[in-house]
Amino acid sequence: MDEASHLPNGSLKNMEFTPVGFIKSKRNTTQTQVVSPTKVPNANNGDENEGPVKKRQRRSIDDTIDSTRLFSEASQFDDSFPEIKANIPPSPRSGNVDKSRKRNLIDDLKKDVPMSQPLKEQEVREHQMKKERFDRALESKLLGKRHITYANSDISNKELYINEIKSLKHEIKELRKEKNDTLNNYDTLEEETDDLKNRLQALEKELDAKNKIVNSRKVDDHSGCIEEREQMERKLAELERKLKTVKDQVLELENNSDVQSLKLRSKEDELKNLMNELNELKSNAEEKDTQLEFKKNELRKRTIELNELKIKSDEMDLQLKQKQNESKRLKDELNELETKFSENGSQSSAKENELKMLKNKIAELEEEISTKNSQLIAKEGKLASLMAQLTQLESKLNQRDSQLGSREEELKKTNDKLQKDIRIAREETVSKDERITDLQKKVKQLENDLFVIKKTHSESKTITDNELESKDKLIKILENDLKVAQEKYSKMEKELKEREFNYKISESKLEDEKTTLNEKISNLAAENSQLKNKIEDNSTATHHMKENYEKQLESLRKDIEEYKESAKDSEDKIEELKIRIAENSAKVSEKRSKDIKQKDEQISDLTQNLKLQEDEISSLKSIIDRYKKDFNQLKSEQSNIQHDLNLQILNLENKLIESEDELKSLRDSQKIEIENWKRKYNNLSLENDRLLTEKESASDKEREISILNRKLDEMDKEKWNLQESKEKYKRELQKVITANDRLRREKEELNENSNNIRIMEDKMTRIKKNYLSEITSLQEENRRLEERLILNERRKDNDSTMQLNDIISYYKLKYHSEVRHNNDLKVINDYLNKVLALGTRRLRLDTRKGEHSLNISLPDDDELDRDYYNSHVYTRYHDYEYPLRFNLNRRGPYFERRLSFKTVALLVLACVRMKRIAFYRRSDDNRLRILRDRIESSSGRISW
C-alpha cells in the first residue's frame, strides 16, 4: 500500500499533486483550503430522487485513483540536492510562488563554512556526495532489477491469461451474431489496432535511431538530450493513451471470451448429460432384451404345458371310452340279469341285490363321467384363458415390432444426420474431434444393440409365430375332441335315459310278478289246507322225511344267514363307497349333486322295497313253519300224496342247490367286482388328487400370467417414456450441432484475433524493455555527470567562484530535473504494472460473475472476490442485472450521472496543481537557459 494514503491531514501542505500521484515538496507551502479527500460524499449532492445512501468507511487520501493504489513512497520524490540560486532576482508574482524558491543556498553555505578550512569541508562534502551517489546507484540498480522481474512475471501471467483466452476464443462468435453493434465496434477497434501497430513500429524505429544517436553522441551534448526527452515524454503520453484504449478493447474481448467460455462449459455439461442418458438407454435396452428372453422362456413353458394338457385330454378320452365300454358291459349284464329275473321269479331277492349293485355301479359311473366332464370344462376354460393370453402377447409383440421399426427409422435418420454433422465438425474443428468420435462410437454401439435387438426380436417373433401356429392346431384338435366327447356324452345321456325308462318298465313288471306270486301263494295255501288232511294221514310215513327235511332247512337257514351277512358286508362296503363318492361329488357342481341326490333317493326306495321283500320272505318262512306244523299234523293224510311231495321236495332241493350255486357264483363275482371297484376308486382318488394339483398349478399360472401382463403394461409405459426421451435427445443433439457450428466459426475468428493480440503484447513487452533500458542508461549518465562535476569542481580555481557557482547551480538544476523525470518514469511504470494487475484481477472477477450467473462451478484455488460489475458497454449488450453496492454508484461517467462535489473538487485541485507544476517547470527551464547563457558568455565556449 502507498504511504501517501496514510499521511495525516497536516502533511498535505507539503504534498504536490501530479498526474500520477502525490509528491512531497518544499515548494508547496500555500495555505489553500482543500476539501478533505477522505470525506464521504453527501447523498444530497447527487440526485434528490435517489434513495438513502449506504454507509461506508472513510477512504484514503488518494481518492482520485483509489482502486489502483499506484503510489510508492513519497521519499523517492525528495530532492537529492538542495536548490541553488545565484544572483536570481525575485519574481514579481510572489503570491503564486513558494517562499522556498527564493532561497539561495550559496549564501547559507558561505555563512556556515569557516574560511580557514575550505578544502577539508569540500573533501567532506565530496565524500558524503560520493556515498549518497553510490547508495542511489545501488538503489537504482535494485529498482531496475525489480522492475525487470516484475515485468517478466507480468508477462508470464499475461501469457497464462492469453492461453486461457485461446481456449475460450472459439465461443465469441455467438455474441457477434447476436449483437451486430459489437461487430462494428470490433472492426473499428481492429482498424485502430492496425494503426497503433504501424505507429508503434514507427516509434520503435525512431527509438532505435535515437538510441543510436544518443549512444554515438558525446557526453557534453545535453541540450539535445533534453529536447529529445521532452519529445519522448510527449510520445509516451500518447502511447499511454493508446495503451489504455487497447487495454479497454482487450478487456472487452476477454469479457466476451469469458462469457463464451461459460457457455461452452454449459454445453459440455449438456453433452455429458446426453452421454449419460445414452448410457441409460443402453442399459434399458439390455434390460428389455432380458425381459424378452424371459417372456420367450415363459412362452416355451406355456407351449410345453399345452402339450401336456393335450396328452392329458387324450388320456381322459381313453378313460371315457373305457368307462363307456364298462357301462355297456354293465348294461348287458343288467339285461342278462333282467332276463334271468324274468325266468327265475323265486330268486327275486338275489337278483334285486344284483340290480342294486348294478345301479350303484351305474351311479358311480355317472358320477365319474360328471367329474370328467367338469374337468374337461375346467381345462376348456384354461385353454380359453391361454388363448386369450396368447392373443394379447401377439398383439403386444406386434406393437413392439411397429414401435421398434419406427425407432429404427428414427435412429437411422438421426444417425445419418449425426454422421454428416460429425464429418463437418472433423474438418472444421480439431478440439472437438475426440468428443465427436466418442459420440460416433456410442451411436454405433446403439445401432449394433438395435440390430441385435431386431435379430432377437425377429427370431422370437418367428418362434412365437411357430409356437402359436402349433398351439392353434392343438387347440383345434382339442376342440374337435371336445365336440366328439360332448356327442358321446349326449349319447350316453340318451342311453341312460332309455335304461331308466326300461328300469321303470322292469319295476312295473316285477310288481305284476309279485301279484302273481301272491296269488300263487294263496293257491298254495289252499292246496296246503287240502293237503293237511292228507298229511295227517301220512305223518307216520313221513316222520323220517321230516327229520331229513328239517336238517336240510337248517342248512338252508345257515346258508341264508351267511348270505345275509355277506349282503350286509356288501351293503356296508357300498355305503362306504357312497360316502367316498359323496365326498368326491362334493367337489362336483351343484347340478351333479342334485342328480346324485335323486339317484340316492331312488336307491333308498329300492332298499325299502328290498326290505319289504325281505319281510315278505320272513312272513313266507313263518308260513312255511306253520306249514311244517300242519305237515306234522297231516302226516297221516299225506300218505297218499307222499310220492307227489317227494317229487316236489326233490324239485325244491334241486332249486336250492341251483340257488346255492348261483349264490356262490354271485359272491365270487361280487368279490371280484368289489376288488375292481376298489381299484377304480383308488385310481379315481389319484386322478382327483392330480386334478387338484393341476388346478392349483393352473391358478398359480394364472397369477403368473396376470403378473406378466402387468409387466408388459409397465414395459409399454417405459417404451413410451423412452420414445419421449429419445425425441428430447434428438432436439438436444440438433442444438448441440448448431452450437458446434457456431463455436467452430468463432474459433476461426478468435484465432485471427489471438494472433493480433499476441503481436500487440510482444510489442508492449519490447517497449517496456526499451523504457527500462533507457532508465538504466539515464541513471548511468547521471552518475557520469556527477563524477564529471566533482572532477570539474576540483580542477577549477578559487578565483572563478561565480562561474563555478553558475555551473554548479546549472548542473544541480539539471540533475534535479532528471531525477524528477526518472521518478516520474518510475511512478508511471508502477502505475502501468498495477493497472495491468488490476486488469487481470478484473478479468478474473468478471469470469467469476459470469460463471455465477450461468451456475458454473469454479475451481477451488480461485479465491478472488468481486463486489459488482460496472462496465457500461457490457451491461448495455447483456441483460445481466448485478446488484450495485451503493445508490451513488448507479450513476457516473459510465452511467450518465451528475458529478458529485468531491470529484469536481478533486479535479479542480488537480488542475491547480498541474498549473503550478507547469509554472515550476517553465521557471526551471528559464533558469537553466539563463545559467547556460551566462556560462557561455563568461567562458566563450560550451563547457558541458
Curated annotation (Swiss-Prot):
Pinpoint motif Nuclear localization signal by residue range: 54-59, 726-731, 742-747
Polar residues composition-biased segments:
28-46, 67-78
Q: Where is the composition biased (Basic and acidic residues)?
A: 96-110
Location in the cell: Nucleus; Cytoplasm, Cytoskeleton, Microtubule organizing center, Spindle pole body
Gene Ontology cellular component annotations, sorted alphabetically: cytoplasm; nucleus; spindle pole body
Region (Calmodulin-binding) spans which residues? Answer: 900-927
| Sorted UniProt keywords | Coiled coil, Cytoplasm, Cytoskeleton, Nucleus, Phosphoprotein
Phosphoprotein among keywords: yes
The record's section on InterPro entries has:
Spc110_C (IPR040593)
Source organism, top-level taxon = Eukaryota
Disordered: region residues: 23-110
What is the purpose of this protein? Component of the spindle pole body (SPB) required for the proper execution of spindle pole body (SPB) duplication. Potential role in cross-linking filaments or anchoring other molecules. It is essential for growth.
**Quaternary structure per UniProt?**
Homodimer. Component of the SPC110 complex containing at least CMD1, SPC29 and SCP110. Interacts with SPC97 and SPC98.
Indicate what this protein is called per its UniProt record: Spindle pole body component 110
Q: What is the lineage of its organism?
A: Eukaryota, Fungi, Dikarya, Ascomycota, Saccharomycotina
